């Protein structure tokens, strides 16, 4: 993740963007990706940002910095009703941003708009910290993680008058 800061500061990757975390001087880096066309995007909130307490629905894949998948959809893209796909449909996952999700998701997802797809690089202290995740050997302590997330729905959205923190 430190090398991402160097890339961002040097401006060598114009697609690399960042979000300043709420507390501290750290950043979470991300790139926008082309979203897959899906039937499960909630069109009434398309283009809106969720609140920090929203229950959101998303496709996601989590990998460690070696690219080893530990959770979420398989392959390069989620599958949503494509009968020609070589893998089964990817069920979207719903989760509460004010609940027990990693801090990096709580920081990044409220900056996303429903319908967007981001590749998010999260520093270890906003993931599973120094202890790692005991449910998998793929996330030892001090692991930075990468998440491919396509936001499909949010049960509460930011008001238009709220200033953006981007």
Please identify what each model-predicted range represents.
Residues 1-166:
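Cross-family detector of peptidyl-prolyl cis-trans isomerase
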